[in-house]
From Swiss-Prot:
Similarity section: Belongs to the UPF0653 family.
Protein name stated in the entry: UPF0653 protein C607.02c
Subcellular location: Nucleus, Nucleolus
Stretch list, region Disordered: 1-33, 47-68, 93-132, 147-178
Database matches in PANTHER family: UPF0653 PROTEIN C607.02C
GO CC list: nucleolus; nucleus
Amino acid sequence: MPTKTKKRSVLEAERKKIGLDHAPKEDESVDDNFPKQFKRLLQQKEYHESKKKEIKKGNLKNKKKKDYGKIQRLPGERLSEFSQRVNKAIPVSFKSGPSKIDEFTDKKEKKKIAKRKEKRERDWNEIEENFEDKTWEADTTGQFIQIESRKKRKNSPDPWANLQTKPSFGETVQAPPELPELKIKETKYLENVPKVNNMGQTESMARRQALGKQRLELIEKYRELMKTKRK
């Protein structure tokens, strides 16, 4: 098969005709080599920059708003068609500013929250109506009657407040501190008192203590009777 490549002499002659690949001159147009999308971006950039300059100078005029006029219903026109025409004529306006949480909550949850608030207010109103006025005695007799308030209870006094005072220089202790006697309740262990009753139900501690007391009382009475019989 004959070779399809050109001879060396032919290739060198073609290169001499083309010449060297120099950079394009200022007069030559290079726009044809750019892609169209890149050209659009350049045009947009130039447009925005020119607009900013005009705004700074104050040459840019505000656009006049369209005067829609009064929209009236045409004779023989349906209400649905008229409403569509009105919606098209009215410009769409979006809310500015941060969105609220209530806009995204479900309608059912909103109703539940509203019902709870109403019930709470109703209960408070009933309590206030049923609340007896106890101030009439204070008005007539002049005696102060303490009424329960919703204020928080005051804090109890600090038992270690005395330790905060620093001793003076050269102070000596005359006697050891006297500690108050602690009232310790004697723990009574209940013996022979079952934890479960005849029905198989567990008994509480208070119930078992009461049964233990009754058992001891009966034992003492029985012993007294036996002593009297022996005599």
